[in-house]
């Protein structure tokens, strides 16, 4: 099992004025602990389940650039980008830019977006769910076309691009790592089967999302995709009461049903080094 650190909270004991040095120290410690992936949320307000919306939150792609400058080996991406927050060609270019500047370490995690409160508050359009999924599929198509050698026009129902030029191309070939987050059985997992390198599923109360994997397998059969070509990743939440042994045991259970990577995030922990300590302990337990 490969462990990732998912940073979902920037309200740390060190305070907002010290976020830069604290974040740099946090990601360096994570990499030194053997953590192979580092991700951030793509939100502008804190999520209600993790803290008050007024708590500190940093923009994802500027933050990934900062993290890339303070790490050397870890793979980096948003977990996950809301499709409605950026024009797809801008998103593709942002990921390409970070991929090049990081030496091929930055990928794209993306989903259909859901946070209506945040969108209404900041003036982002929040279309109905069916349109958000249409935007998601077209965004996936645009990104993959821009990350290829094609400069042909793109004609979608929502987006039209006259020339999909993206120079320089990403270092990662054939394209940056592409993960789709969410477990929606009709649309999300179908898009995973069609376009993605990886899926990302939540773990609720220790229950393994094995049914979602069965659904993904059926979608792969429908579209002619090799199910084993898709990486299966999961989320693990830890609290102040969590132990390295507990995390390692849950990760072992996930590995037993086909997951190869897990992203660990904190709930109610205001000292980021405590999160790294738990993950380090889980890694040491194998």
Predicted regions and their residues:
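Glycine-enriched alpha-helix->loop->beta-strand junction motifs that scaffold or abut catalytic
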Residues: 34, 70-73, 102, 191-199, ...
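N-terminal beta1-alpha1-beta2 module of alpha/beta enzyme domains
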Residues: 1-70, 176, 265, 269, ...
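Short, acidic/polar
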Residues: 17-30, 91-94, 181-194, 242-255, ...
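Active-site-proximal loop/turn and secondary-structure-junction residues that shape catalytic pockets
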Residues: 9, 44-45, 82, 112-116, ...
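Structural motif corresponding to the early beta-alpha repeats
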Residues: 65, 69-87
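Internal, glycine-rich beta/alpha segment that forms the wall or movable "lid"
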Residues: 50-51, 78, 84-195, 210-222, ...
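An alpha-helical appendage that flanks or caps ligand/catalytic pockets
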Residues: 7, 29-31, 36, 130-174, ...
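Hydrophobic faces of well-ordered beta-strands that scaffold small-molecule active sites
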Residues: 3-7, 38-40, 75-79, 106-110, ...
